[in-house]
């Protein structure tokens, strides 16, 4: 059999050699059986020259076409039209993407299958997508739909495809004989043009069959730079509006009969990824205005009108688990699953407690928990809320229960319905497996020594861990302690002289101490610590999160990923924002304590009044930072200097108004941006009167300063503790809360902040010039905080 490949090409010069070699070197004879039509969709790189080089070698097999840029669908359509106009006699066509590549047996497997299935009723062949992670050079057979290929070759009637859905045109073969005049929808961007095309084709040929071949392997490249088609699709309005309207809804409306299960499942699969993303990253929808958000929600509900509840319940996809099935049924269908499940999420071997969670949508439900037929002792509980758009998607009840050694049976009833129990993805009838794991963890914990390991950043100290270490060193001299810090740190010699036991954050000895430590106490949550010995590094250790500052925004998305045993907070509002019900955090009164920050003891003690120093301390932007390197530091981002952040702060720092404050009023100006920004200091090209190098403690800066200017940084709380004024310069508020690593929380800068908020630097300077001689008059401080003996309080909680 002969085959045609149509490939849409756009700026893929660095991938074309892999693409061509994988096709030319096929086990099935390339020259006799495989023809390639490459449609250059207006590439601006060297793609055309590379294609023409291969075309010279194989003029009968390779066709090159050029068109102005119009998108993948228009390029593929040009290829299909070229086939028709030139009367191609190849019965099968596929749409291999030119940044991907094929297994050597790819065409051979398809050809062998067709040779043994000549009954002419196969209209589509689906092939096995293997993900190739370019950065790690890793092949992973973990595509969400790979269950289709876990057994031998599968042949299914199109009317009964059900879960065997096909969304990729690149990894399937279409029989030209049945294609008629069907083309890709050129209006559909950034995705679903493949899925719509294939499934319109299957609906047109509902009485034919499709085959799925496990050994025909298609290697999908996950690009190192994150520029694969699927990586950026959620950054466009079309993903939320056009795809739902012209993609999903059009597919449903064009179906001439009842929408078959496979077509429902295609849309359910694609729409699920949208829902999943928006529950965990609601800020992604900020690209839509209010009218567009309303339209998006309306389109979601219209699409779900075509999707049967039965398909939602039965959909076979690992990621589409109980949580999403229950939530989607509740949200879109106002229905519930017939069964309910409680999940045992975590085991605390130290306190003989287990964390049980279950999902619900009725706040007024009644719960009864029995351990061996006796009412269980609930140690801590929490209601976590999941939202989708402007409505609750689902609630999660989190309960810590105390176990006894001989506890055998756990029964949980919600509104008299008994919940099934799941542990490690398996249903369980009793607690035997739980107790085995509990005892195994206890044995592992016995291997810990009485060592406390402290860390701020691997390359910087001068934060809460340093201050708490110093307190323990002086007040609990018998306690075994060590401090993790690179020898290259500017703090290394200072702490060494003071008697700190310093440990290099790499090598065998570092890992050995992580293995032996009973408590790891850090102001940051860095991968080099929590992943030092693999994913279970902290399982049988206490991780004490001292924090880098006071949480004022919603950090739940980041912090919920981590195991934290003691979570330090400093203000009543911060504490309540984390442990309270109906928020996004997983943490409860079990982990979260109100003590104040360790560094505050020294801060208050060393405060200096009547100084003339302005401290400028903007925070960082995750989206402007380079890639994370080893030990938490980040590489330079060459695009940083083009950013609004850089331009606005450079304009501010180089302004005549700032210089006037220094010269006319005799103020020192100190610019100390976030540590992740300091690598760009030279780019700001600042005047000599601005101090940027500071080798002392960061605390001294707060104590010696009379005013702070920041944007969103929680260091403003340090000035509030000292009852000193703060001004906020926020020129990018909308962008910041959409693109940074957290979303807006309980803290309103205008109501709760410690000074005026300005979007324009000229307004800030105008205000400051009026108030410069009476700075104490502009102090705003309504905070309820914990500031007495903070180190002592923290150690008491740790012990």
Regions found by a protein language model. Name each.
Residues 12-26:
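Short, well-formed alpha-helical segments that are part of the catalytic scaffolds
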Residues 40-49, 71:
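A conserved acidic beta->alpha catalytic loop
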Residues 67-88:
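Glycine-rich, basic loop-to-helix element that forms the pyrophosphate-binding segment
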Residues 101, 105-144:
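Conserved donor NDP-sugar-binding/catalytic core segment of glycosyltransferases
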Residues 155-243:
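Conserved nucleotide-sugar donor-binding catalytic segment
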Residues 258, 462-476, 598-683, 758:
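Conserved catalytic-core segment of nucleotide-activated headgroup transferases in glycan assembly
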Residues 442-445, 449-603, 623:
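Active-site and donor-binding regions of nucleotide-sugar-utilizing enzymes
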Residues 588-589, 682-687, 712-783:
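Catalytic binding pocket for nucleotide-activated donors in carbohydrate/polymer assembly enzymes
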């Amino acid at each position: 059999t002969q085959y045609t490949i149509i490939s849409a090409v756009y700026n893929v010069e660095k991938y074309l050699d892999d693409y061509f070699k994988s096709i030319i070197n096929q086990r099935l004879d390339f020259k006799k059986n495989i023809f390639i039509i490459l449609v250059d969709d207006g590439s601006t790189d060297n793609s055309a020259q590379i294609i023409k080089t291969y075309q010279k070698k194989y003029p009968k097999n390779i066709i090159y076409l050029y068109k102005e840029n119009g998108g993948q669908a228009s390029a593929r359509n040009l290829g299909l039209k070229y086939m028709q106009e030139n009367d191609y006699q190849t019965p099968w066509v596929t749409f291999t993407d030119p940044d991907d590549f094929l297994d050597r047996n790819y065409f051979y497997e398809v050809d062998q299958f067709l040779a043994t299935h000549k009954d002419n009723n196969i209209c589509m062949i689906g092939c096995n997508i293997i993900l190739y992670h370019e950065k790690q050079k890793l092949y992973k057979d973990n595509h969400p739909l790979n269950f289709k290929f876990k057994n031998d070759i599968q042949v299914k009637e199109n009317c009964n495809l059900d879960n065997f859905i096909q969304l990729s045109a690149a990894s399937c073969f279409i029989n030209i004989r049945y294609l008629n005049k069907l083309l890709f929808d050129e209006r559909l961007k950034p995705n679903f043009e493949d899925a719509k095309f294939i499934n319109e084709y299957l609906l047109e040929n509902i009485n034919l069959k499709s085959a799925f071949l496990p050994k025909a392997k298609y290697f999908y490249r996950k690009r190192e730079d994150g520029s694969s088609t699927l990586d950026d699709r959620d950054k466009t309005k079309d993903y939320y509006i056009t795809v739902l309207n012209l993609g999903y809804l059009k597919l449903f409306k064009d179906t001439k009969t009842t929408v078959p299960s496979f077509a429902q499942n295609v849309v359910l699969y694609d729409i699920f990824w949208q829902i999943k993303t928006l529950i965990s990253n609601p800020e992604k929808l900020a690209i839509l205005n209010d009218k567009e958000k309303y339209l998006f929600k309306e389109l979601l509900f219209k699409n779900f009108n075509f999707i049967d509840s039965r398909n939602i319940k039965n959909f076979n996809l690992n990621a589409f688990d109980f949580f999403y099935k229950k939530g989607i049924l509740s949200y879109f269908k106002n229905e519930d699953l017939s069964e309910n499940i409680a999940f045992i999420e975590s085991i605390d071997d130290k306190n003989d407690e287990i964390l049980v969670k279950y999902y619900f949508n009725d706040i007024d439900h009644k719960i009864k928990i029995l351990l061996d037929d006796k009412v269980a002792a609930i140690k801590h509980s929490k209601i976590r809320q999941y939202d989708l758009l402007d409505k609750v998607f689902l609630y999660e009840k989190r309960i810590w229960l105390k176990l006894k050694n001989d506890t055998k049976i756990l029964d949980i009833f919600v509104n008299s319905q008994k919940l099934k129990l799941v542990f490690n993805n398996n249903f369980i009838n009793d607690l035997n497996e739980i107790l085995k794991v509990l005892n195994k963890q206890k044995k592992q914990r016995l291997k810990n020594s009485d060592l406390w390991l402290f860390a701020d950043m691997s390359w910087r100290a001068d934060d809460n861990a340093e201050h708490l270490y110093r307190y323990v060193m002086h007040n609990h001299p018998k306690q075994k302690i060590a401090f993790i810090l690179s020898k290259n740190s500017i703090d290394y010699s200072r702490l060494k002289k003071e008697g700190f036991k310093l440990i290099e954050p790499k090598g065998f000895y570092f890992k050995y101490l992580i293995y032996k430590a009973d408590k790891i106490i850090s102001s940051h949550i860095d991968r080099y610590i929590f992943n030092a010995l693999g994913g279970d590094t902290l399982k049988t250790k206490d991780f004490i999160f001292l924090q880098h500052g006071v949480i004022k925004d919603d950090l739940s998305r980041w912090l919920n990923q981590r195991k934290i045993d003691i979570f330090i907070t400093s203000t009543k509002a911060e504490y309540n924002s984390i442990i309270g019900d109906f928020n996004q955090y997983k943490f409860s009164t079990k982990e979260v304590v109100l003590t104040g920050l360790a560094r505050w003891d020294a801060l208050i003690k060393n405060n200096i009044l009547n100084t003339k120093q302005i401290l400028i301390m903007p925070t960082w932007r995750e989206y402007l930072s380079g890639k994370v390197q080893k030990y938490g530091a980040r590489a330079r981002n060459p695009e940083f200097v083009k950013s609004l952040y850089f331009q606005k702060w450079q304009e501010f720092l180089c302004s005549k108004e700032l210089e006037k404050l220094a010269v006319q009023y005799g103020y020192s100006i100190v610019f100390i941006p976030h540590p992740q920004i300091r690598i760009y200091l030279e780019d700001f090209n600042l005047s000599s009167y601005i101090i940027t190098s500071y080798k002392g403690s960061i605390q001294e800066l707060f104590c010696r300063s009379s005013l702070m200017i920041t944007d969103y940084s929680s260091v403003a709380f340090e000035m509030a503790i000292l009852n000193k004024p703060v001004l906020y310069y926020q020129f990018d508020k909308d962008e910041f809360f959409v693109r940074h690593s957290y979303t807006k929380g309980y803290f309103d800068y205008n109501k709760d902040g410690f000074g005026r908020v300005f979007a324009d630097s000229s307004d800030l300077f105008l205000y400051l010039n009026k108030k410069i001689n009476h700075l104490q008059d502009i102090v705003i401080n309504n905070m309820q905080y914990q500031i007495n003996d903070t180190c002592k309080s923290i150690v008491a909680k740790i012990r």
